[in-house]
Every structure is written in structure tokens, then in C-alpha cells.
A protein has these predicted regions:
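N-terminal nucleotide-binding beta1-loop-alpha1 segment
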Residues: 1-14, 188
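Short beta-strand/turn micro-motifs composed of small residues
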Residues: 2, 48, 95, 122-123
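Short, structured coil segments at secondary-structure junctions
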Residues: 16, 61-63, 138
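Conserved N-terminal catalytic core of the sugar/cofactor nucleotidyltransferase
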Residues: 22, 26-106, 171, 204
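Residues at the starts of beta-strands that form the adenosine-phosphate
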Residues: 42-44, 90, 117-118, 160, ...
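Catalytic-core segments of class I nucleotidyltransferases/pyrophosphorylases
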Residues: 92, 99, 108-112, 126-127, ...
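A short, conserved acidic/glycine-rich loop-to-beta-strand motif
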Residues: 114-124
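Conserved catalytic core of nucleotide-sugar-dependent glycosyltransferases
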Residues: 131-142
Length: 216
């Protein structure tokens, strides 16, 4: 997911997309793409928005198979309005602003352990200064998401989901919070165990500089 405008990172995003900001001598999105290219995946897709042509050109050179223009759309729009809606298989969802060590073997094992749910969020331990949706669970079933009711875990931005299953059991929604709300009501939103690999989210210029120091 790389269509965000990145307003909180102005002026760095005045003339480029958030995904194309320089991070440790590479593009911010390149941290994940480099890892994904080494995995046995059927395809890699990205969403683009602001300065989408520039990002799409870079992504294709980096081995991305599908580009979806979601400019001025919500972050879940692609799931109901592109060919991915027909995908009846696990789809790993990442955000371009995460600095994360992708342990696909662990994520896949968690997905199978929880009986291949419609949607599974990957929680992390909260990091000071980084906002997130706090997750309340009962036997790994998510019963509430909140920005104010603090819990020991919150969403990392990493999910594994089945687009066709989601289309079959929810009404169209533009943003993930509305999708998750529908799934919670049907007891279909699951949380994995807490992710312990490297994870950091970049939403501001200060966080970018912090990440550069932490993950050089």
C-alpha cells in the first residue's frame, strides 16, 4: 500500500510520493520490495496515488507485477474495485512506510494456525511516539480496535487476508477501519501472536531520521 499523500512528512513529500522518500540510500518502499523479491510469491502488487507515475515506473523496475491507481480513494478501495477482489487466496498486505523484517514463514504459520481466517492482523508491541490502533482480543479474536483504549498490542499495518472472502461477507468500504468493523461484528477478524521481528513506522520527518539511526 503506497498511495498515501504523506502530508505529515511535508516538505519532503512536496514533489514526490511518501514511498519514494530517501531512506538509507534507497527508496522508503524499497525496504520491503527488496525482501519480497527474495520470497516465493505469485505476484507483487502496489497501490499508487500522488506522483503515481513516478512510483509506478520505479516499482516495475523493481519487479512489481501489478499497479493499481487509487488516487483520492480510501486505503481499502482496491479490495472491492480491482481484479484482486476475485482472489480466493491469502494476500499479504504491507504499508510502504513500515521498516520491517518480513518473516513470511512465521506469518504463514500463524495464518494456518488460526484456520486461514478471512482477515488476520499482525500486532506489535507499541513503540513510543508512533500511533496505532490498540487491539483487544479474546482467544485471538479481535473484539475491539481503539486509538484511546490502550492495550499491550496494536496494529502494525501488516495483514494477511482473503479478498474474495471479504467481498462475500462485507459491504463495500473505502477504508480498512470500516472493513474491520464489519468483520468484528461477524467474529471474523483475528489477531496473530505478537510480532517480534524488527518493526518501525515512519509518518513524520523526525521518525524518518530516527529510523535511519536505528536501522543503518
Amino acid at each position: 500500500m503506497a498511495a498515501g499523500r504523506g502530508l505529515r512528512m511535508m516538505p519532503l513529500t512536496t514533489n514526490t510520493s511518501k514511498a519514494m522518500i530517501q531512506f538509507n540510500n534507497a527508496m522508503l518502499i524499497g525496504n520491503s520490495l527488496k525482501q519480497l523479491k527474495k520470497l516465493d510469491l505469485q505476484s507483487i502488487s502496489i497501490t499508487v496515488g500522488y506522483k503515481g507515475a513516478e512510483l509506478a515506473e520505479y516499482a516495475i523496475k523493481e519487479g512489481v507485477h501489478n499497479i493499481f491507481n487509487t488516487n483520492e480513494k480510501g486505503n481499502a478501495w482496491w479490495m472491492y474495485n480491482t481484479l484482486l477482489k476475485q482472489l480466493d487466496a491469502p494476500l499479504l498486505v504491507l504499508t510502504c512506510d513500515n521498516i520491517v523484517e518480513i518473516d513470511l514463514e512465521w506469518i504463514s504459520a500463524q495464518y494456518l494456525k488460526h484456520n486461514s481466517p478471512t482477515c488476520m492482523l499482525i500486532p506489535v508491541t507499541p513503540v513510543d511516539g508512533i500511533e496505532g490502533d490498540f487491539i483487544q482480543t479474546k482467544n485471538n479474536q479481535i473484539i475491539n480496535l481503539s486509538r484511546t483504549e490502550k492495550t499491550p498490542i496494536y496494529g502494525s499495518g501488516i495483514q494477511i487476508l482473503n479478498p474474495k472472502k471479504i467481498n462475500d461477507c462485507t459491504e463495500k468500504a473505502d477504508n480498512f477501519y470500516d472493513v474491520w468493523t464489519q468483520l468484528i461484528a461477524q467474529e471474523l477478524l483475528i489477531a496473530s501472536e505478537t510480532y517480534t521481528k524488527t518493526w518501525y513506522s515512519i509518518n513524520t520527518e523526525a521518525q524518518l531520521h530516527t529510523a535511519e539511526k536505528l536501522y543503518t
